[in-house]
Amino acid sequence: MSLSPDNSSTAASKLKPRGSSQGGMRQYNERVVLQAIRLNGQISGAEIARLTHLTAQAISLITKRLLDDELLIKKTPQRGKVGQPSVPLVLNPDGAFAIGVKVGRRSLDILLVDFSGAVRERWNLSYDFADPNQILGHISQCLAKIKHKLSAKLWERVQGIGIAAPLHMGGWQQLLGLDADVVARWERFQLKEEIATLTGLPVQTLKDTTAACVAELVAGRGRDMRNFVYVFVDTFIGGGLVLDSHLHLGKHGNAGALGSLPLGLNGGGKHSPQLLNVASLFKLESRFITAGLDGRATSDERAASPEYWPHTQAWIAETAPPIAFAMLNSTCLLDLEGVILDGCFCSAVKEALIVAVEAAMQDFNWEGIVAPQVFAGTIGSDARALGGALLPLYANFAPDRDLFLKLDNAQ
């Protein structure tokens, strides 16, 4: 499978949740109101009017429509010192749903996400190597379970499916020991078309680590940062790039492909190793297996347990300097505000890796540039599937159809 991500334009100017009281803007202003509530939580109509610069009358009409459409819920009125009690409004979690599918090299994740962005159901399938037929069969089973769990009315509110997957599932064949037949099947397999045919739902696709970056951008620490590189460590390390609060995809949807970054000059007729060769979880998995331990422990709390920790520490010591080197090169080009690091591992491993990366950054020459601060990602292993689910939700309900536009609170 050679994934072709749905590349939305990044040229749109930055948008605040501010509406227009002119005619013909009903749908847009409804999206503005929904986004204001999404960003600010439980707020009153008066507060929505202040944030969006729409009139009180317009807000009253819009919120009535959204309440009638069951996209909003009224909460208990709050009495102030004077005047009528204010009625807080919140998003109705059952107002809409989306399905996120992460197809990885070692596992498959499927999430049912509600209108508030909360994960309602999850399924996981682990494997040694990704087989397209096995993956499609499991997705089909999970979608049937979702349809069974939701009433017919709620199933009609499913906005679509977002797929997060590597651009080239058959890549780095020798590194992972992939069977040539499996690689050939992936080259012929059209996952997006197969799932669309299976469900009849709209299907959107995005590179897996870019989808993870989407989740962090709109639901995590990225909401407070305008320019950052996002690093996600899984079987292979990868990433995403946010510039001026926009997710930057690049010409081929592959911006932020940190895993392919060379770690030095070619020499002796050999290519320099790439970052993914030395700073990926498959290396930690190999360490565990060599020590007679369970390789699957890379993604859970066992990696920080006494039995596993010496091997995890050795991997961190090997991994941190190359990541720091990648941050140096990225900063030279982009003048970064920060780096957000996350991955498919427990919080203890993430925290230790960040400390090691920060220490390794001190060993490089930063003269002429300002070193970025390294932050822990807030989403974790769900980031890729959650980012996939956010694709249809934001396409249908955000003020701008460009998902990759982060909205600021109007002041």
Region roles according to the model:
Residues 1-75, 81-124, 130-154, 199, ...:
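ATP-binding/phosphotransfer module of carbohydrate and carboxylate kinases, centering on a glycine-rich
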Residues 39-40, 219, 234:
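Short helix-capping/turn signature of helix-turn-helix
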Residues 48, 77, 124, 180, ...:
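Short clusters of small/polar residues that mark proteolytic maturation junctions
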Residues 98-102, 158-162, 228-232, 238-240:
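Short glycine-aspartate micro-motif
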Residues 105, 211, 235:
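Short, glycine/acidic-enriched loop or turn micro-motifs at the edges of active sites
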Residues 119, 124-227, 352-363:
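Glycine-rich phosphate-binding loop and adjoining helix at the ATP-binding site
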Residues 168-171, 211-213, 238-239, 248, ...:
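Short, active-site-adjacent cap segments at secondary-structure transitions
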Residues 225-279:
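Glycine-rich phosphate-binding loop of actin/hexokinase-like ATP-binding domains
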